[in-house]
Amino acid sequence: MAVLLKLGVLCSGQGARALSLRSRAVRPAFVSAFLQDQPTPGWRGTQHIHLSPSHQSGSKAASLHWTSERVVSVLLLGLIPAGYLNPCSVVDYSLAAALTLHSHWGIGQVVTDYVHGDALQKATKAGLLAVSALTFAGLCYFNYHDVGICRAVAMLWKL
């Protein structure tokens, strides 16, 4: 009977909220991060989790960069089938630009994450910019003087 009484208290409006939001055993960590207005009574030494630095959270340039990365990724999802269904020079040059941008931004993030030191990181990013420019120039040269990206991939598939 005592168990049913305690279960009834826990399942009431206040008891269920207390069980689900206040108990560290039940509450997942990601919920804890967003419940920062009232600390849990009886718990000391809890830290507030900040998901992003406050000085970068309002940056319009970072938001536009993130959005443009997603636009290029979605554009690639449409260009690849378009290159298969309708291989033409417009799709070839669009693929050259989108693939170069996508790989440049992706490798740039790897450089940012894993290359340490300001001078080394700047030199690596300068090298990446040079390689990306040469890649785009090479793909455009290939599109202009040869069969193009779409037809070249189709020829490879026929092998």
Swiss-Prot record:
Pathway terms, separated by semicolons: Carbohydrate metabolism; tricarboxylic acid cycle
Mitochondrial intermembrane side: 86-90, 143-159
Transit peptide (first-last residue): 1-56
Chief location bin: mitochondrion
Transmembrane intervals: 64-85, 91-111, 121-142
GO cellular component, one term: mitochondrial inner membrane
Name the UniProt record assigns to this protein: Succinate dehydrogenase [ubiquinone] cytochrome b small subunit, mitochondrial
Originating species: Rattus norvegicus
